[in-house]
């Protein structure tokens, strides 16, 4: 989960992914600065638009300010952890459905994403630190336990956080990325061997800048 080490790269990647899906009508033409500005404005508008029953606030946790979207009140807490390159907005439909089912639902912008603090140093994005962000979030919310739900890279964060702090979670849901245990060889080594000089997004995002 190496993001915004990065700050400029993460922002441009988010924009690039949006272009792939929103500028299909350009039929291969290069996006202009005006196109980029329009898309970035659309992304910001969607991520900050009011949604019925969903409230936003900043939580101080583990030395950062974390923006959360929350809904519901009295039920068990469900913590929704997004992947890359995403934000709380990826969970907008699930937030409403879970709240309607009686759960308290919280979907944070993870460290380095959205409106949450983005430390400049890559060393501040290790899994132990990210897990501590979520435990600090539970503490700030006054919750002893939660159901952890992760998607994509958020699934990796979800597994590790639950492994580090099993007493704080009653259940774990990992979407898109299954738990594979500890590998015998570093995945980075295997990916470098497999892809060589060819583009692979995980290798690309291990290059600071």
Where are the language model's segments positioned?
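Boundary at the C-terminal end of the N-terminal hydrophobic targeting segment
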Residues: 28-34
């Amino acid at each position: 989960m190496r993001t915004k080490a990065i700050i400029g790269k993460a922002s441009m990647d988010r924009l690039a992914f949006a272009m792939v899906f929103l500028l299909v009508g350009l039929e291969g033409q290069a996006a202009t600065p005006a196109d980029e500005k329009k898309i970035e404005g659309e992304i910001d508008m969607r991520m900050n638009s009011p949604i019925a029953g969903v409230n936003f606030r900043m939580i101080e946790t583990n030395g950062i300010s974390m923006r959360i979207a929350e809904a519901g009140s009295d039920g068990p807490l469900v913590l929704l952890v997004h992947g890359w390159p995403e934000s709380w907005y990826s969970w907008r439909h699930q937030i409403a459905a879970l709240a309607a089912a009686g759960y308290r639902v919280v979907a944070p912008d993870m460290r380095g994403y959205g409106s949450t603090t983005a430390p400049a140093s890559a060393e501040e994005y290790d899994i132990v630190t990210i897990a501590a962000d979520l435990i600090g979030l539970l503490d700030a919310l006054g919750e002893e336990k939660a159901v952890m739900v992760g998607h994509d890279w958020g699934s990796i964060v979800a597994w590790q956080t639950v492994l580090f702090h099993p007493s704080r979670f009653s259940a774990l849901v990992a979407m898109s990325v299954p738990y594979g245990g500890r590998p015998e060889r570093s995945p980075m080594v295997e990916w470098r061997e497999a892809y060589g000089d060819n583009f692979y997004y995980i290798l690309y995002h291990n290059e600071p800048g």
